[in-house]
């Protein structure tokens, strides 16, 4: 069952299969989800690794300027960060417990703060009141006279007053102590608030340059960090959950945790990601936190705080602690100083009343000073000494005098004496120290200062030197570090890309394997089902074929090819065809998985009988239909019985035995109402067999039409001629021409109540496929009795408009005529079968699965072919197709010989081919595949890319045919450096006018006359130096012999009169010839030209050997001796001298100048002698006239004066033959010899035509390109081969005349044809040689072209030559064509081996032994 039916629950009993399928799909989906989760974890880990890499770079950059201690500090910071991270992980593990503890601790702190606030307020009020009272007492003490005591006491008294007595344990704390304690408590109670205020002050100091918006964003960031509840070290207040910043109730109530709504968490995370949009804030804060991962299994949100922010907060904390410590010390010192002042004021106040109220005591000097209390211990290093050591730090002070008593009882006088003695001793010691040690210490201090400054200078220079070294080293380190960092980034990027690519490939491979496995399983199930369906449909078709074959006896015509399996099949004779057709078993309603073979066979037999009954009923219905009343009611061919058909009498020819059998087969098909395909090999008379069946219907059953014949345009006239020739009684309507002509012709069938009898306006209408498409609306209105489609491969595409229009015609029977039912693929055979039996062959996909794939793969790769399947295919095709081949039915027609002539590219062709190949080197394999896989269809369904490839293939084929298809050689000539003169009006002149040489060189040279007269002429004509004259003129072969002075000098030696020699030297050459001809009796007419060429040793002197004029009486003798060997001799030996004259006796210039010019014009000023002599030497009027035709006036004058009768001087080209070939002008015409040798095919064709012409063969040459035909016509004209041409541009009437001329005129040597235009339906049996200059995509087109000569009426051996270029596109095309031909042979003839085609390499030696037609 299909996947769609399985999922939609359309099949019954498929629950288990559906559950298994869904279970497999769920497992695959779970595996895909698991892979996706692993991929997400991998991406998170890669992101963390990249962050760590950035942090390492930041640390490395920051550590460049660190010292050893700072590096240690950084290392300790890293360790503390690691400890914090471990603590954070521990916090993540026990988060719920820690959060509960933090909340409880926070609540307790809030309660304690609320309890301490009233006490703190009271303490502040008391301290404020005490401060007010102290200030009041101090003002009073200042007003009292305490100066004597201060003067007496001096510095020691002040120092003693600064020391306060210390109470014993258990005693009440003095007021000063209580005040200090209160201050300390106050400080301790407000410590956290002070820290918070100091932190806020620090932040304000740092952000005083920032905007208010950035400060608000920072505060929001800190609040959000506190909301997320980040925990760090327990001692780190900045990161502890109980941070100093107070939380509002709203914050606590709206705080998010991991159990909050996912939408709120996402919104908060989005807020955190969108913070600090300004670049300045981002640079300062770096980042607040990064959400690493949300673990849905443990419901936790992992957050990471960057180390840079951690260091900033730790530094702030250290600074705040230092500030608090300094403030506490300053407050303590201030409190102690304030307390000492308060004690002194109290002591002074007590002593003053005692002196006023107790005079007895003041008068007595025996007042003792007792020890009042233990002195207060001093702090050492900030720690108070223990109570166990009551040692006094200072001596006791007498409260009355304020002098020290040193623990003894003494009077005030004694105390003052001791004080004076102490002061004297103290001053003496200081004086001695100042006198003795001050100078020494001063020198020592100066020396130490100088040494220190020197050391400072040395240290600074060393430091500067080391700093410079470090700076240079640091630059190199930075550069190396950057290089290493870039390399590391590249390597890391390439590594991860490689891993990602490998993982993607693995993932895709796994998915592809899973899909392939599922597809394979589905294909196995579908193949089993299709096998049963195939067996059902084949059985149905074979039974149908059996029913029809029993009626039309196809086995008797083609031989017994029945399938042996039908003998063991159930008895089909039991099926009664007379019963009405039962319900048809539709294929899609049959369950091929559950039905057994017997039931399937029964249903197939039922379907076959139904199809046959429907076909017969359609034929009966057509015969029973009438356009109006009883029209065509006389047609009832099915009532005739089975009889043996004889040749119709109205057929004006004698059918051969196999043609008569074909007539019987066609008649039986008509009786059964079945359409057929007459697929006899080309040349066996398909046309006459189809005409004979029309004649049979007209003669036997009085059915005279209407018949329609559809044929290609090239065979329209041939059909008209054949029908008129074989059945003269038929009236033919040729339906083609322009629109007006066709409109007139349609009147023949637009009449109502028209009966088609012998007297009907027409019986057979002949038209083309183009007319069918254009006038389909008119032709479909007619009810055609019989339709004949000639060359039915024209409807090989079921998608074409031809096929659709013809299928919609109302026809009783259809007959397809084709010699090649299969041209490119099995699809074309299916299109023809579907056209004749649409109900039986309705699915091309099934037909392709059954037969096409197996047969086409066998042809391409030579795989094993299923013979049983091939026999079943033949059994199916047998009722509808009749095919005979020539060698089986006609023994007098021999096999044709096919020869592939392989040529090598010429140098120019190879260069062009390589250039084209280099331009498409990337897709050259695709182009070759296109060349080998192209079917050559004309459907026009190729895509844009396919059309581009085919255009490129066509360019390669042009190179193989001839390079001139790209660019023709042109006439070349040098630059003409000249100026042309202009003549006056010639209206006043006679019939002949002498025109001087008008071209002149633009460069002219003016020669002074003095130089010409005195230097040139005397030296040339003077005979003073006889020796020089003789040596340089007489004895030199290059000296002129017409010097009058020299002749007069030598006349005495020669024995001739000087006047005679002078007269001869000054006469013109024509005059001398006339005189010689008229007055010399020794010269005969036949010896005139022997005098010119000096071949005859006559009695004439050397002076008489000049140019003579021929006479009409001796014209033939003159022509005989005009050329070297004689014209007549050359005409009698043309073949022998052809190669010598054309190839060996031709001289061509090796160099052609780039520019040409006449000689430079020389003018002698004041003299015309030089100009006259020059013009007479170069442009003698008599000589120039002698080179052309002599005017009648001159002939008359010469005849009257000299009695010389002549017509004209001979044509110049006859003097002599090699001259016109040995010398040529600078104007170069394209060489035909080079034109021939630059194409390998044309070169071999030239050699082959010479041999074929010698053997009196007649040749058909087929082309694919009309431009190539133009080039070949030039070649044939050059070789003077008589030829005619037919291509697609030829008109219909011209085609008929060309074919008639070829068949009747034997002097035509070559017939040039286009393969598409001249390869269908025409008879060219006068030719015995076929040459394919370039092959068609479709091998069937070439086969049809061959059969124009190899067909009935051919009495000679037919030889086919195919010119191919080795190692190119053409060779690939030829291999593909052989595969297509093999498919045709397998299907139509049952052959499994290819035809034997000879392949010959066309080098010089092998082509000589090339077999020629007999």
UniProtKB/Swiss-Prot annotation:
The gene is INO80. The DBINO region is involved in binding to DNA. GO terms for biological process: CENP-A containing chromatin assembly; chromatin remodeling; DNA repair; positive regulation of transcription by RNA polymerase II; regulation of TOR signaling; subtelomeric heterochromatin formation; telomere maintenance via recombination; transcription by RNA polymerase II. Its main location: nucleus. This is Chromatin-remodeling ATPase INO80. It comes from Eremothecium gossypii (strain ATCC 10895 / CBS 109.51 / FGSC 9923 / NRRL Y-1056). It catalyses: ATP + H2O = ADP + phosphate + H(+). Residues 667-839 form the Helicase ATP-binding domain. The keyword Nucleus applies. The lineage of its organism: Eukaryota, Fungi, Dikarya, Ascomycota, Saccharomycotina. ATPase component of the INO80 complex which remodels chromatin by shifting nucleosomes and is involved in DNA repair. The keyword Transferase does not apply. Gene3D superfamilies: P-loop containing nucleotide triphosphate hydrolases, Tandem AAA-ATPase domain.
């Amino acid at each position: 069952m299909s996947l769609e039916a399985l999922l939609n629950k359309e099949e019954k009993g498929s629950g288990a299969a559906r559950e298994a399928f869904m279970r497999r799909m769920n497992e695959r989906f779970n595996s895909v989800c698991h892979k996706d989760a692993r991929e997400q974890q991998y991406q998170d880990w890669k992101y963390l690794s990249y962050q760590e890499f950035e942090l390492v770079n930041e640390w490395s950059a920051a550590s460049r300027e660190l010292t050893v201690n700072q590096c240690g500090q950084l290392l300790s910071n890293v360790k503390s960060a690691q400890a914090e991270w471990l603590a954070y992980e521990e916090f993540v593990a026990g988060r719920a417990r820690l959060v509960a503890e933090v909340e409880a601790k926070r609540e307790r702190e809030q309660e304690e703060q609320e309890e301490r606030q009233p006490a703190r307020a009271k303490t502040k009020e008391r301290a404020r009141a005490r401060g007010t009272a102290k200030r009041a007492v101090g003002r009073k003490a200042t007003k009292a006279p305490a100066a004597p005591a201060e003067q007496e006491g001096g510095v020691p008294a002040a120092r003693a007053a600064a020391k306060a007595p210390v109470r014993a344990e258990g005693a009440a704390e003095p007021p000063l102590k209580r005040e200090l304690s209160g201050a300390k408590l106050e400080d301790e109670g407000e410590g956290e608030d002070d820290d918070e205020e100091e932190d806020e002050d620090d932040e304000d100091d740092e952000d005083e340059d920032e905007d208010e918006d950035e400060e608000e964003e920072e505060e929001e960031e800190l609040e959000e960090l506190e909301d997320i509840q980040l925990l760090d070290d327990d001692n780190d207040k900045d990161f502890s959950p109980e941070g100093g910043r107070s939380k509002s109730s709203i914050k606590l109530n709206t705080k998010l945790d991991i159990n909050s709504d996912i939408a709120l968490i996402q919104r908060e995370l989005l807020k955190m990601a969108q913070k600090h949009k300004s670049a300045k804030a981002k640079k300062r804060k770096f980042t607040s936190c990064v959400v690493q991962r949300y673990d849905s299994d443990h419901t936790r949100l992992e957050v990471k705080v960057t180390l840079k922010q951690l260091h900033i907060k730790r530094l702030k904390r250290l600074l705040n602690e230092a500030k608090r410590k300094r403030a506490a010390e300053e407050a303590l010192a201030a409190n102690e100083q304030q307390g000492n002042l308060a004690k002194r004021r109290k002591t002074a106040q007590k002593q003053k009343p005692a002196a006023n109220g107790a005079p007895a005591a003041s008068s007595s000097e025996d007042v003792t000073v007792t020890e009042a209390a233990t002195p207060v211990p001093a702090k050492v290093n900030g720690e108070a000494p223990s109570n166990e050591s009551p040692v006094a730090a200072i001596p006791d002070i007498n409260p009355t005098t304020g002098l020290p008593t040193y623990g003894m009882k003494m009077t005030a006088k004694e105390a003052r004496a001791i004080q004076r003695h102490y002061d004297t001793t103290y001053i003496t010691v200081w004086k001695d120290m100042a006198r003795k040690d001050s100078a020494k210490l001063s020198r020592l201090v100066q020396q130490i200062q100088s040494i220190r400054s020197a050391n400072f200078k040395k240290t600074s220079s060393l430091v500067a030197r080391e700093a410079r070294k470090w700076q240079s080293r640091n630059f190199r380190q930075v550069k190396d570090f950057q290089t290493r960092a870039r390399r590391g980034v590249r390597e890391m990027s390439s590594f991860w890309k490689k891993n990602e690519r490998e993982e993607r490939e693995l993932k895709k491979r796994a998915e592809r394997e899973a899909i392939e496995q599922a597809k394979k399983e589905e294909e196995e199930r579908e193949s089993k089902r299709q096998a049963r369906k195939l067996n059902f449909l084949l059985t149905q078709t074979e039974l149908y074929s059996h029913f029809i074959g029993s009626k039309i006896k196809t086995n008797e015509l083609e031989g017994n090819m029945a399938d042996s399996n039908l003998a063991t099949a159930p008895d089909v004779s039991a099926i009664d065809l007379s019963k009405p057709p039962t319900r048809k078993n539709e294929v899609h309603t049959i369950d091929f998985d559950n039905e057994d073979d017997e039931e399937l066979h029964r249903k197939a037999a039922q379907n076959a009988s139904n199809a046959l009954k429907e076909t017969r009923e359609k034929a009966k219905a057509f015969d029973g239909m009438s356009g109006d009343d009883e029209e065509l009611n006389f047609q009832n061919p099915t009532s005739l019985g089975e009889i043996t058909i004889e040749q119709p009498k109205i057929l004006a020819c004698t059918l051969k035995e196999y043609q008569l059998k074909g007539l019987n087969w066609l008649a039986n098909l008509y009786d059964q109402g079945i359409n057929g395909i007459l697929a006899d090999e080309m040349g066996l008379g398909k046309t006459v067999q189809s005409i004979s069946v029309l004649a049979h219907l007209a003669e036997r059953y009085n059915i005279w039409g209407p018949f329609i014949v559809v044929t290609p345009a090239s065979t329209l006239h041939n059909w008209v001629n054949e029908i008129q020739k074989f059945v003269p009684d038929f009236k033919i309507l040729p339906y083609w021409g322009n629109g007006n002509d066709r409109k007139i012709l349609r009147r023949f069938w637009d009449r109502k109540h028209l009966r088609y009898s012998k007297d009907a306006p027409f019986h057979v209408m002949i038209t083309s496929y183009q007319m069918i498409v254009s006038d389909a609306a008119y032709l479909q209105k007619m009810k055609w009795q019989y339709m004949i489609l000639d060359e039915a491969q024209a409807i090989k595409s079921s998608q074409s408009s031809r096929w659709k229009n013809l299928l919609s015609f109302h026809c009783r029977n259809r007959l397809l005529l084709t010699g090649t039912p299969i041209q490119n693929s099995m699809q074309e055979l299916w299109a023809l079968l579907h056209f004749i039996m649409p109900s039986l062959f309705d699915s091309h996909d099934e037909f392709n699965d059954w037969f096409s794939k197996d047969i086409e793969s066998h042809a391409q790769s030579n795989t094993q072919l299923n013979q049983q399947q091939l026999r079943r295919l033949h059994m199916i095709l047998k009722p509808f197709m009749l095919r005979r081949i020539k060698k089986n039915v006609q023994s007098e027609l021999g096999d044709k010989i096919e020869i592939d002539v392989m040529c090598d590219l010429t140098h120019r062709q190879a260069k062009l081919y390589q250039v084209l190949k280099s331009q498409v080197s990337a897709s050259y394999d695709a182009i070759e595949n296109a060349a080998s896989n192209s079917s050559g269809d004309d459907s026009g369904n190729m895509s844009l890319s396919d059309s581009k490839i085919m255009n490129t293939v066509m360019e390669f084929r042009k190179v193989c045919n001839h390079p001139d298809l790209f660019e023709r050689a042109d006439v070349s000539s040098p630059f003409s450096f000249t100026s042309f003169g202009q003549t006056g009006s010639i209206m006043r002149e006679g019939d002949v006018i002498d025109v001087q040489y008008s071209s002149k060189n633009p460069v002219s040279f003016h020669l002074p006359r003095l130089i010409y007269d005195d230097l040139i002429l005397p030296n040339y004509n003077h005979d003073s130096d006889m020796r020089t004259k003789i040596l340089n003129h007489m004895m030199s072969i290059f000296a002129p012999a017409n010097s009058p002075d020299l002749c007069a000098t030598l006349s005495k030696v020669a024995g001739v009169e000087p006047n005679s020699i002078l007269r001869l030297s000054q006469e013109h050459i024509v005059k001398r010839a006339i005189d010689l001809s008229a007055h010399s009796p020794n010269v005969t007419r036949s010896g005139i030209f022997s005098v010119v060429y000096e071949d005859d040793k006559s009695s004439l002197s050397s002076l008489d050997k000049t140019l003579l004029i021929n006479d009409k009486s001796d014209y033939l003798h003159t022509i005989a001796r005009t050329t070297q060997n004689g014209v007549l001799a050359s005409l009698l030996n043309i073949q022998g001298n052809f190669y010598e004259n054309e190839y060996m006796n031709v001289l061509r210039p090796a160099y052609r100048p780039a520019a040409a010019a006449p000689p430079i014009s020389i003018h002698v000023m004041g003299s015309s002698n030089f100009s006259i002599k020059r013009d007479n030497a170069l442009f003698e009027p008599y000589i120039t006239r002698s080179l052309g035709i002599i005017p009648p006036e001159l002939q008359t004058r010469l005849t009257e004066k000299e009695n010389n009768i002549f017509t004209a001087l001979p044509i110049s080209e006859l003097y002599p033959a090699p001259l016109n070939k040995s010398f040529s002008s600078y104007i170069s015409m394209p060489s035909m010899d080079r034109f021939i040798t630059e194409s390998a095919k044309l070169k071999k064709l030239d050699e082959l035509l010479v041999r074929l012409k010698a053997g009196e063969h007649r040749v058909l040459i087929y082309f694919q390109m009309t431009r190539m035909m133009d080039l070949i016509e030039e070649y044939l004209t050059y070789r003077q081969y008589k030829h005619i041409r037919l291509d697609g541009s030829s008109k219909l009437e011209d085609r008929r005349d060309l074919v008639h001329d070829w068949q009747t005129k034997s002097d035509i040597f070559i017939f040039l044809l286009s393969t598409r235009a001249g390869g269908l339906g025409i008879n060219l049996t006068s030719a015995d040689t076929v040459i394919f200059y370039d092959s068609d995509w479709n091998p069937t087109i070439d086969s049809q072209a061959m059969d124009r000569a190899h067909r009935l009426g051919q009495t000679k051996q037919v030889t086919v030559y195919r010119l191919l270029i080795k190692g190119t596109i053409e060779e690939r095309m030829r291999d593909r064509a052989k595969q297509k031909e093999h498919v045709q042979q397998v299907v139509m003839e049952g052959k499994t081996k290819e035809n034997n085609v000879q392949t010959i390499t066309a080098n010089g030696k092998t082509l000589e032994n090339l077999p020629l037609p007999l």
